[in-house]
């Protein structure tokens, strides 16, 4: 079992910490305990995927025997579908029957939450009402967009071509919804509002660029860097001094993916100096000022994924994987050894 940790959260799993953040990283390592932990997390959720159209719980506690869902639907099905699909794509495995049914359940659940404008409805996001999120928020919609992308590739590998094409159509619908509903010009940048009626910049506007939506990527990343970057991390919103490291880690990976490698490298070095080598060594933290900046291991998996998802920009096709490296000027060569991709350990060198 992999649990968030932090001196408090043990024998429990969360849809964001375990399924969305950690499971995709575990797939690359080929560590036996981590593979067990990834599949344990998936398995524990199986009984909660129901025929009553109820959201899955945000967290399963006490070794999966009970649950917590105090914030309602946080977009947890989207988190599960995204992270679990990526796990199987990275491993080069097809899901067994239980996992296959779980992925299909999540896809159906998300589809039923797509509003007429193309956004995906949820009660809140992973911040659980600490900040406003409206009836539909950018995080849930962007993760859903990414989830249908990777799930569609997995379906293609499974020979489910019609269902894969349906995923592509749902992706397009959500992308249109994100543009129409959340697209906005804020602080002089063509970027996104986090939910309808909100005109302040939020850190999670980095998610569409991370998930591959390019239309407002530069504006969103510009706004974040100018207004929210501070001391090696991101403020969650421009009007409050609240920090959640997870968004900073997605942001750095998004900078790499957007081709802004020098900027990404500078941000990564600053984060490493502050978090890994500085006063909060040796891990990134959950939040400030909440809970004394405790360490959570799921966020640390996101730090590792800056390299795989950002600098190397690993992608997936029906046949295998792709690499689209983004090397900053400071690096002339990158060597990767014993990374697990699509059925085996691989080593490769990236030269400019």
Task: Give the residues covered by each predicted segment.
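Acidic/polar, glycine-enriched structural segments that form the non-catalytic walls/loops
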Residues: 1-11, 93-96, 100, 155-157, ...
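Extended glycan-interaction surfaces of carbohydrate-active proteins
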Residues: 1-13, 39-72, 107-136, 173-246, ...
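Aromatic-rich carbohydrate-recognition surfaces in CAZymes
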Residues: 11-117, 137-145, 251, 261-264, ...
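Alpha-helix C-terminal capping/termination sites
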Residues: 15, 27-31, 90-92, 154-157, ...
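Amphipathic alpha-helical segments of tetratricopeptide repeats
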Residues: 88-89, 153, 272-273
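Active-site neighborhood of glycoside hydrolase catalytic domains
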Residues: 138-182
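Long, well-ordered mid-to-C-terminal structural blocks that present hydrophobic/aromatic surfaces
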Residues: 248-254
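Non-catalytic C-terminal accessory modules of carbohydrate-active enzymes
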Residues: 257-352
């Amino acid at each position: 079992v992999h649990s968030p940790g932090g001196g408090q959260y043990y024998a429990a799993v969360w849809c964001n910490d375990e399924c969305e953040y950690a499971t995709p990283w575990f797939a690359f390592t080929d560590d036996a305990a981590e593979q067990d932990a990834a599949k344990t997390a998936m398995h524990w959720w199986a009984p909660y995927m129901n025929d009553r159209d109820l959201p899955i719980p945000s967290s399963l506690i006490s070794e999966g025997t009970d649950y917590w869902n105090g914030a309602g639907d946080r977009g947890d099905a989207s988190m599960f579908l995204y992270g679990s699909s990526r796990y199987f794509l990275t491993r080069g495995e097809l899901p067994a029957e239980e996992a296959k049914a779980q992925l299909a359940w999540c896809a159906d659940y998300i589809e039923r939450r797509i509003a007429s404008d193309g956004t995906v409805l949820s009660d809140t996001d992973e911040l659980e009402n600490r900040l406003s999120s409206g009836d539909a928020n950018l995080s849930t919609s962007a993760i859903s967009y990414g989830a249908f992308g990777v799930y569609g590739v997995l379906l293609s590998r499974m020979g489910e071509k019609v269902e894969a094409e349906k995923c592509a159509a749902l992706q397009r619908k959500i992308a249109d919804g994100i543009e129409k509903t959340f697209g906005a010009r804020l602080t002089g940048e063509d970027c996104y509002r986090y939910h309808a009626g909100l005109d302040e910049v939020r850190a999670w506007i980095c998610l569409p660029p991370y998930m591959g939506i390019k239309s407002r990527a530069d504006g969103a990343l510009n706004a974040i860097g100018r207004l929210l970057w501070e001391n090696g991390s991101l403020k969650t919103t421009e009007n409050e001094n609240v920090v959640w490291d997870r968004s900073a880690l997605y942001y750095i990976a998004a900078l790499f993916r957007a081709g802004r490698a020098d900027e990404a490298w500078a941000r990564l070095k600053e984060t490493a100096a502050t978090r890994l080598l500085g006063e909060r060594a040796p891990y990134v933290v959950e939040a400030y000022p909440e809970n004394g900046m405790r360490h959570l291991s799921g966020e640390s998996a996101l730090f590792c994924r800056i390299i795989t998802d950002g600098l190397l920009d690993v992608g997936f096709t029906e046949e295998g994987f792709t690499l689209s490296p983004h090397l900053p000027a400071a690096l002339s060569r990158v060597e990767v050894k014993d990374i697990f991709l699509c059925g085996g350990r691989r080593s490769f060198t990236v030269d400019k």
